[in-house]
Design a protein with these regions (language model features):
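Short Asp/Glu-rich motifs
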Residues: 7-8, 106
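Catalytic core of non-heme Fe(II) oxygenases with the double-stranded beta-helix
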Residues: 9-84, 124-131
Length: 146
């Protein structure tokens, strides 16, 4: 569950889900289910339209609570239109595992909660080398925090 409490919910850095999942072929989707209404003020998910067409982008440590990675080249993202879908409780967003997305902090008096379910192609496999490199990156971040 993704929880952004009223007035204190933290931002989620821009990222691609498949950077975490490492699904070969990237045939994977996220279903984001709104548990209450969501808009720009309470930190709705935002999307960079068309960003999924460029494969997995370089990520780096974000050092953000609850999110370990972020897109490295933020200038690259400036070429895309950013969408801020407004949702009501029960609405569902479906996005591809390569689409760049994130969310801003919650500055409103309303909580923003969402539940996600991920699906992948039944023939999908995992990129074990990517997983190994990601684990190394996580270990470096942990060492820097100690």
């Amino acid at each position: 569950m993704f929880n952004k409490p009223a007035r204190i919910g933290l931002p989620s850095p821009d990222h691609q889900d498949n950077y975490y999942w490492a699904v070969k072929g990237s045939n994977a989707l996220t279903f984001w289910i709104a548990l209450n209404s969501s808009d720009k003020n309470n930190g709705c998910v935002h999307y960079y339209d068309g960003s999924h067409k460029f494969g997995i982008l370089e990520h780096e440590a974000s050092f953000a609570k609850g999110s370990s990675q972020k897109i490295s080249d933020t200038n690259f993202l400036k070429k895309f239109k950013t969408s801020y879908p407004k949702l009501e409780a029960g609405d569902v967003l479906i996005h591809h595992s390569l689409v760049v997305h994130g969310s801003s902090k919650n500055i409103s008096k309303n909580n923003r909660r969402g539940w996600t379910i991920q699906f992948k192609d039944k023939n999908a496999s995992y990129d074990l080398e990517h997983i190994k490199n990601y684990e190394k990156s996580l270990n470096k971040q942990i060492q820097l925090r100690v």
